[in-house]
Amino acid sequence: MQIENSAAIVTGGASGLGAATARALAARGARVALLDRNAAAAAALADEIGGIAVTCDVTDETAVRHAIARSATAHGPLRIVVHCAGIGTAGRIVGRDGPMAQDAFEHVIHVNLGGTFNVLRLTAHAMSQLDPAGEERGVFIATASVAAFEGQLGQAAYAAAKGGIVSLVLPAAREFARFGIRVMAIAPGFFETPLMNELPPDAVQKLVAEIPFPARFGKPEEFAQLALAIVENPALNGETIRLDGALRLPPR
């Protein structure tokens, strides 16, 4: 898929991996719509890159439909979606205070997996109505996690949600093949994000020690670089790519 002059949506686009991806797409000439719950941060970045900002909860069908319509009105046919929105929470299934609350588990699944599916189904439907751009109509990139493969203690809900995203990619790609819509996922390891930047130095050193090479947190720009490579390579479809410096998470 050509990036220049293509309309793109980036969810979770106001910070972290989403913001880096939005900047990278805009730098290559894409017309970017930032979807985020943080209206002020999204608006500031939209002004910086010449895009638009739409306040959006990715689990809300009405909000996502509105965002797709806003993008189409401002930028034309939607071709690229990079879904970065999600939450990271920790909690043991059975902790000192008893079993994890069922609604706490369901909330993580609802936001991370349900939100991904909601954005996927609605944007894919919009893309399916378009005329092809070359040999394809669009591409959707989800954000999984290495926790999908090696969930640590306290990550049961998060790992289950991200594992669901990994499992969603292939059947979705097979289903959308008739439309010429690709579906991919990136599974990042430890990255420089607002959450990670709040960790104390000793905790950072402990995490970095688990990464073979490069022995550091990934940079959001490196996530964005892979996202753009996926967009431009039509043979990449139905797969989750780990982006982790050969990291394999230990049990804790």
Question: Across the structure, where does each feature detected by a protein language model lie?
Answer:
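Active-site helix of classical SDR
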Residues: 120, 161, 169
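Conserved mid-core segment of classical short-chain dehydrogenase/reductases
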Residues: 88-106, 125, 129-134, 154-157, ...
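Residue(s) in the substrate-gating loop at a strand-loop-helix junction
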Residues: 145
